[in-house]
């Protein structure tokens, strides 16, 4: 059993495709209450799963427990979050780390200034987080730093933040953008939504 544990720990520490670190970027929180509710949870909603699927021929609800993709990554592929002893760890982290980009913490007066960051500001902070994560995972290992990549998983406006990071040269350097291996977005308005006559993706080029 100890040998199995050691083997798992070694695999978790190694920078190796497809098990790169994963950064989750949540979507838009409209009201102050939604922001506070968001910042009050460790995973900002990404841990939400389900117990019901509607697949029975007679239309009845079938119970099926799906723990959420984030939890399944921990259970099935030995990923770990970066929380320990009540805080977010910044020292040596395994390659199979799950990180929540907590850009809304700044908007919660309990944690920050109370001012909601713009898409550009959140994207800039995301680039800084990627750099810190590389340093925490790789240290000064030159080969590991060269091999380091991350996956971005984004919901709703989080996808626009990821696009801003990758498409706006004023937000992140080419070195930071090159560390992003893949981006997965869902419910992201890539074609834009009209808010008071302003098309949201236009912010990406500002």
Tell what function each PLM region has.
Residues 1-153, 157-206:
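N-terminal non-catalytic accessory region
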């Amino acid at each position: 059993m100890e040998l199995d544990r050691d083997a798992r720990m070694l695999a978790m520490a190694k920078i190796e495709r497809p098990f790169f670190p994963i950064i989750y970027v949540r979507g838009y929180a409209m009201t102050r209450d939604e922001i506070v509710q968001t910042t009050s949870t460790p995973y900002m909603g990404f841990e939400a799963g389900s117990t019901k699927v509607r697949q029975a021929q007679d239309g009845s609800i079938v119970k099926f427990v799906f723990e959420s993709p984030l939890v399944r990554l921990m259970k099935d592929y030995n990923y770990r979050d970066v929380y320990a002893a009540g805080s977010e760890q910044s020292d040596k982290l395994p390659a199979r780390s799950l990180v929540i980009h907590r850009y809304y913490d700044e908007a919660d007066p309990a944690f920050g200034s109370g001012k909601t960051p713009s898409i550009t500001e959140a994207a800039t902070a995301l680039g800084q987080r990627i750099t810190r994560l590389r340093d925490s995972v790789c240290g000064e290992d030159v080969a590991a730093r060269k091999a380091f990549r991350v996956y971005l998983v984004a919901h709703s406006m989080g996808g626009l933040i990821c696009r801003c990071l990758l498409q706006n040269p004023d937000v992140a350097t080419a070195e930071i953008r090159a560390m992003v291996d893949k981006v997965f977005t869902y419910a992201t308005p890539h074609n834009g939504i009209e808010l008071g006559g302003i098309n949201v993706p236009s912010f990406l080029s500002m």
